[in-house]
From Swiss-Prot:
SUPFAM superfamilies: L-aspartase-like. It holds the Pfam family Lyase_aromatic. The keyword Lyase applies. CDD domains: PAL-HAL. The keyword Cytoplasm applies. It comes from Koribacter versatilis (strain Ellin345). Keywords: Cytoplasm, Histidine metabolism, Lyase. One of its GO terms (molecular function) is histidine ammonia-lyase activity. Its EC number is 4.3.1.3. The modification 2,3-didehydroalanine (Ser) is found at S144. This is Histidine ammonia-lyase.
Length: 516
């Protein structure tokens, strides 16, 4: 695969996916390197002349009033990296670790952070050679960015900390040595540029968006199958209804449901029944699924801005290069302290996405209830069980779905409405974005499991509808489910079926089955 040139300005979510999951190689773009070098020259000029600049010739946080002499700058870099690596808890996945390295490297490529190109090159080489820092998941309050997670990432660059390499958890020094990467000695400002930013919460958020897009598409396919076997109507998806309330997600879902439900023998068998409208979990799929799609789109837009932003502090703004300027001329510029590390924009989006996916799981669970409840299932066997009574069928899977949905409700409480004071009251309002990200991870997994149960239940219900057939597209959905989970003809342990259906959804294959 062709190497991705990082510029700091053009990274896309699809490129993140390619680097994280498909190991696309990355490197620092040559034009970006020139900008990086120019900003670095400003830092070196400040250090050489011992001028006052936050985090360059001073301590950080509450200790920003302490001057650091140039002779002690390397010690400061090492101390900052070690002292900020205070994470606890289970490590983030290797995929999140890869995303964090990519995002940090891309942000530094903008040329407003003041690091050497060598720092970015080393991050890129770690990505390319599969050195993935072990990053504890807890310990960030989301301002000044994700300090602890990013410090654990930075430790590996200097040959410390731990890394996953070729399936093993080893020391950072051992991982670099095995991969043929030389550890670096950090110079002035480079530690703060590596650890001050939103890349941990953002990495989790970006991967969650990729998962959420698959879930949203899968929800339409599984929901359509549930509606058909429950003898629902597609009248509520009439294009005129949705043009009257033209939210883009709603219009998109309604059109998708019309496409999925066209040509069903099951529908034809009850078209003259007396029921004029369905329950909300069936009738309002465009409004609910559509709102989820709109939320995903909004969160994606926030994250795409963030991943092409400079988010450390202070930022370095070199003077424009003059015509005829000598290559060895000193470069001057402004070093300005600000707050781009603050995770609030990302935290809000993470919380919003959590709420949306919680709703998607909730409506899925309500359809499961209709499939298994003989008072609601339009003639299907109780709990979709062959020989109900002797067999319990889907009685307990609905309970599992209910448990997951209820957990999601608790996890959907916004983390970003909370704050706590840190660093001697210097950092007195924080985003809690990493907490939002970790909750979102759990909600994504719970939602996928709920949808897996709905897919299994809807497939089981369709089996009972034979010889009547659903639409050709929904037959493909059914076939995809049956390829990983056979029909339940008597009670069996369903744990493996749940896992297989969850993996089918996660891979995107179930959504793909319904496309054409």
């Amino acid at each position: 695969m062709k190497a991705l040139h990082l510029t700091g300005n053009t990274l896309t979510l699809d490129e993140v996916r390619e680097v994280v999951y498909e190991q696309r190689p990355v490197l620092l773009d040559s034009d970006a390197r020139a900008a990086v070098d120019r900003a670095r020259a400003v830092i070196e000029d400040v250090v050489a002349n011992d001028r006052l600049a936050y985090a360059v010739t001073t301590g950080v946080g509450k200790l920003s009033d302490v001057r650091i002499p140039p002779a002690e700058n390397r010690t400061l870099q090492l101390n900052l990296m070690r002292s900020h690596a205070v994470g606890v808890g289970d490590p983030l996945s290797e995929q999140v670790s890869r995303a964090m390295m990519l995002l940090r490297a891309n942000s530094l490529c903008k040329g407003w952070s003041g690091v050497r190109g060598l720092v970015i090159d080393t991050l890129c080489e770690m990505l390319n050679r599969g050195v993935h820092p072990v990053i504890p998941s807890q310990g960030s309050v989301g301002a000044s960015g994700d300090l602890a997670p990013l410090a654990h990432q930075g430790l590996v660059l200097i040959g410390e900390g731990e890394a996953f390499y070729q399936g093993k958890r080893v020391s950072g020094a051992e991982a670099l040595r095995a991969a043929g990467i030389k550890p670096i000695t950090l110079e002035a400002k480079e530690t703060i540029s590596l650890i001050n930013g939103t890349q941990a919460m953002l990495a989790v958020g970006l991967l969650a968006v990729l998962d959420a897009e698959i879930l949203a598409e899968t929800a339409d396919a599984v929901g359509a199958l549930a509606l058909d076997v429950l003898q629902g109507t597609d009248a509520a998806f009439d294009e005129r209804i949705h043009k009257a309330r033209p939210h883009s997600g709603q219009i998109q879902v309604a059109a998708n449901l019309r496409r999925l439900l066209a040509g069903s023998q099951i529908h034809e068998s009850h078209k003259d029944c007396a029921r004029v409208q369905d329950a909300y979990s069936l009738r309002c799929m465009p409004q609910v699924h559509g709102a989820v799609r709109d939320t995903i789109h909004y969160c994606r837009s926030v994250f795409e801005v963030e991943m092409n932003s400079a988010v450390d502090n202070p930022l370095v703004f070199p003077e424009p290069k003059k015509v005829g300027e000598r290559s060895d001329a000193p470069v001057h510029g402004d070093i300005i302290s600000g707050g781009n590390f603050h995770g609030e924009p990302v935290a809000f989006a993470l919380d919003f996405l959590a709420i949306a996916l919680s709703a998607l799981a909730g409506i899925s669970e309500r359809r499961i209830e209709r499939l298994v409840n003989p008072a609601l299932s339009e003639g299907l066997p109780a709990f979709l069980a062959p020989g109900a009574g002797l067999n319990s069928g889907f009685m307990m899977p609905q309970v599992t779905a209910a448990a997951l949905v209820s957990e999601n409700k608790v996890l959907s409480h916004p983390a970003s409405v909370d704050s706590i004071t840190t660093s001697g009251n210097k950092e007195d309002f924080v985003s809690m974005g990493m907490t939002a990200a970790l909750k979102l991870q759990r909600i994504v997994q719970n939602t996928r499991n709920v949808m897996a149960i709905e897919a299994l239940a809807a497939a089981q219900a369709l089996d009972f509808k034979a010889p009547l057939k659903t639409t050709k597209l929904l037959q493909k959905v059914h076939a995809a489910v049956r390829a990983v989970s056979p029909q339940i003809t008597e009670d069996r342990i369903l744990t493996a079926d749940f896992a297989a259906a969850e993996a089918l959804i996660r891979s995107g294959k179930l959504a793909a089955a319904a496309r054409n």
